[in-house]
């Protein structure tokens, strides 16, 4: 699965360009203005940093009701990046300017980037990439329709409003970054932005035409799983192997394409689904990707369409369909560390999903979402006020729905 690793490291090879013109300066306390601060000509890549320092850096789906999005777990700066980058569902190569809610700071031993030590470069790359890469990665995980973005060639520059000062007490130069500018680029396989738009339309048409039938969520997901397997095949050499294009438009795909296509179809059907990265082997430079999907019982189950279709046979397998952690994790290991970015996955059910089994809900889980919380109290209140609801709100089991059920739910939530 070497192509998965290449995709994983794509953003690691994106050039980080530091603006060298008009860098502002400031003085505060024991700090002295540095009018000669020079960042011109400095070029860094995340790949070089990862190679030298390792990867341990802390730092409608599409927002349909009940969905799970990695963008919900970001800090303020990366949320700002996320909100700008998700607009790229409409392809564009225009520069994206992000005003950072929280000033990014780092210290160096010199005011000239050309004289940065390894320690200076590390401090710089940690600060800047930590403020933007998790946001970019989360967008690409939450929005697989941004299939065209070649993060390997995205230039990232800091704004001309960056300031530098010298601290006599520490003997260090302190930098303050207020703005990050990122220039998107499409993969070379697309000759122009017009080509990107053409394939975007083809993908949308394929998803819209992806008719599946099923009386239950299980039946629907099984149909999605089967149709993807029947349409495409595993092929590392295919033109669109690491894209949902290869799973839904032009056959030939690897794990990224399988899982992204599965998520796109689930998104269109309103079924919560996420991409999961794992089986990461840094030495062998391999990795894998699959899906977690939420069923009506509120629990999450694993689906690996790739491994159910590896032999390209006409017979569809279900060895990795709606599995719990006990069986699935024998050969699947999710990785929370997506090289700088930290991913927070939904908790996987322990047991495999059993179709037709009656789900058991916790006391107070009135809306049947798998958890007991304020949403259940609101659900109960709406029912008492006369709204039509799907599930019974007789929380105290007295045979009727009344204000006593609201009181019961309040006590339950406070206990």
Task: Label every model-predicted segment.
Residues 2-26:
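Sec-dependent N-terminal signal peptides of Gram-positive bacterial secreted proteins and lipoproteins
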Residues 19-25, 358-415:
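Cellulosome-associated attachment modules in secreted, modular CAZymes
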Residues 26-215, 331-361:
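N-terminal accessory/pre-domain segments preceding catalytic cores
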Residues 77, 81, 132-135, 199, ...:
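Stable alpha-helical elements in mature extracytoplasmic
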Residues 188, 193-248:
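Secondary-structure boundary elements
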Residues 194-197, 214-219, 253-257, 371-375, ...:
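Soluble non-cytosolic domains of exported or imported proteins
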Residues 208-212, 226-234, 263, 267, ...:
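Sec-exported extracytoplasmic/periplasmic mature domains
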Residues 257-328:
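Hydrophobic/aromatic-rich core segments of domains that either
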């Amino acid at each position: 699965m070497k192509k998965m690793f290449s995709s994983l490291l794509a953003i690691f090879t994106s050039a980080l360009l530091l603006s060298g013109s008009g860098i502002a300066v400031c003085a505060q306390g024991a700090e002295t203005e540095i009018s000669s601060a020079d960042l011109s000509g400095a070029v860094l890549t995340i790949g070089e940093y990862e190679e030298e320092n390792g990867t341990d850096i802390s730092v409608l789906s599409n927002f349909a009701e009940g969905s799970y999005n990695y963008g919900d777990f970001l800090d303020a700066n990366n949320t700002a990046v996320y909100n700008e980058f998700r607009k790229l569902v409409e392809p564009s190569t225009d520069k994206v300017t992000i005003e950072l809610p929280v000033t990014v700071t780092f210290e160096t031993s010199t005011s000239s980037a050309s004289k940065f030590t390894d320690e200076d470069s590390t401090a710089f790359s940690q600060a800047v990439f930590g403020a933007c890469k998790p946001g970019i990665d989360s967008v690409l995980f939450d929005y697989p329709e941004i299939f065209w973005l070649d993060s390997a060639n995205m230039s990232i520059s800091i704004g001309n409003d960056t300031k530098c000062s010298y601290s006599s007490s520490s003997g260090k130069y302190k930098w303050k970054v207020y703005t990050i500018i990122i220039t998107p680029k499409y993969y070379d396989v697309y000759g122009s932005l017009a080509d990107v738009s053409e394939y975007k339309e083809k993908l949308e048409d394929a998803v819209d035409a992806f008719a599946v039938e099923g009386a239950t969520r299980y039946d629907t997901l099984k149909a999605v799983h089967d149709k993807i397997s029947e349409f495409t095949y595993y092929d590392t050499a295919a033109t669109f192997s690491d894209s949902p294009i290869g799973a839904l438009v032009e056959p030939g795909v690897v794990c990224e394409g399988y899982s992204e296509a599965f998520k796109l179809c689930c998104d269109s059907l309103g079924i919560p689904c996420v991409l999961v990265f794992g089986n990461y082997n840094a030495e062998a430079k391999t990795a894998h990707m699959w899906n977690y999907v939420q069923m009506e019982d509120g629990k999450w189950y694993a689906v690996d369409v790739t491994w159910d279709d590896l032999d390209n046979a006409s017979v569809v397998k279900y060895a990795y369909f709606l599995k719990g952690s006990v069986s699935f994790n024998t050969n699947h290991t999710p990785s929370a560390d997506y090289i700088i970015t930290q991913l927070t996955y939904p908790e996987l059910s322990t047991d495999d999903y059993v179709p037709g089994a009656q789900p058991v809900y916790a006391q107070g889980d009135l809306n049947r979402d798998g958890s007991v919380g304020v949403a259940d109290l609101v659900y109960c209140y709406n029912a008492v006020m006369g709204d039509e609801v799907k599930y019974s709100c007789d929380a105290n089991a007295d045979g009727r729905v009344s204000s006593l059920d609201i009181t019961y739910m309040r006590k339950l939530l406070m206990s």
